[in-house]
Amino acid sequence: LVGEATYSSAIINAVELMPIFEFDENMNARTVNGKRLLEYWGYNSVNFFSPNTSYASKPEHNCEGTELKELIRELHENGIEVILDVVFNHTAEGNELGKTFCFKGFDNKVYYMLTPEGNYYNFSGCGNTLNCNHPIVRQMILECLRYWTINYRVDGFRFDLASILGRHEDGSPLNNPPLLELLAYDPVLRNVKLIAEAWDAGGLYQVGSFPASRRWAEWNGRYRDCLRSFLKGDFWNAWDAAWSISGSGDLYGGFYSDHNDNYAGYNSCVNFLTCHDGFTMYDLYSYNEKHNEANGWNNTDGSNDNRSWNCGEEGDSTNPEVLSLRFRMIRNACAVLMSSRGTPMFLAGDEFGNTKHGNNNTYCQDNETSWINWKLLEKNHDLFEFFKFMIRF
């Protein structure tokens, strides 16, 4: 732990952890080619107030909580902030056919958005939608964030499918969502970073129009899509690329924006090319197509809109010219990302060429496909040094 924290402090000042709340690992569990596949990413919460017990190193009472606090303390001592990815848009209870863990039994009509016929609205794409702006649910979310801030001393939260947090109980988008304003102005959370994934699975896309109250930042999905296309040679969108590199001022505070007063300028913009969803940066320049066969869905899962380029050969290669071009493209991407106005974010392992071998949806791959291959740090040390240089630039 100490070694990895010291390594990380050499290049970053914050780490965003994927969901660490207790979740249902057995949801949609199945066997594919002799391998047992479980929910790995953690986006099916069961309890918002407890860390996932399976992350503990020993089967001891509250070992997971103690070790998480030790991790956060160690990261803080190395100058690294900790941001939690939180999932308040749905739970692991699913739709009418799903399990009952908690909220269905407490008060189904209060905690979930229901149609007039009593069915579950599915703005999350996961079977149900948390009724975030109901007063009781609103208070629960606030108390949860306060709990993690006070007891675990986390520095920020990234909200998965955050546009759901701005929907009315009937599912319609609100102009001034009570929950978002409550979190923005809460005194306990005043120094905590709030980061939105400003869209949902119901078609609500709010990048540049999220109800931010000059307090929220957001993942800039437009930056990702635009720069991925531009970097692989789609020069027709050079104008949009220039806007994105210069800070997306048309969205977050600059020319031609109708939402300037809503955002806190360029600090509201989190630029990224890669995250847990989709290709790693190495795979972005090693594959033209996704290769998700190991997930067991005949390669139908995961996005087809990857905006990637394999540099002349699909997948693994021993061709020195192809490999040289791939690492040049990664350096190009890193240079653009670190030079863009806003806050840069990249996927752990990108700094030394980690690969998922073309799988762009590793939600069920708790194995070498998803695990970071630390041996690549030594093999691709020149790339790591380039990342360090650009971050300090």
Model regions and ranges:
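Substrate-binding/active-site clefts of carbohydrate-active enzymes
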Residues: 1-154, 161-188, 204, 254, ...
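Catalytic cores of secreted or luminal carbohydrate-active enzymes
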Residues: 379-393
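Short active-site segment of divalent metal-dependent hydrolases/proteases
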Residues: 88, 353-354
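Short histidine-centered catalytic/ligand-binding loop motif
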Residues: 318-322, 373-379
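Conserved alpha/beta catalytic core and glycan-binding cleft of carbohydrate-active enzymes
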Residues: 153, 169-170, 174-348, 352-353, ...
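Short, hydrophobic/amphipathic alpha-helical packing segments
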Residues: 69, 142-145, 327-338, 387
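A residue-level signal for conserved active-site and pocket-lining positions in enzyme catalytic cores
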Residues: 17, 276, 390
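Acyl/amide activation-and-transfer machinery of modular secondary-metabolite enzymes
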Residues: 363-374
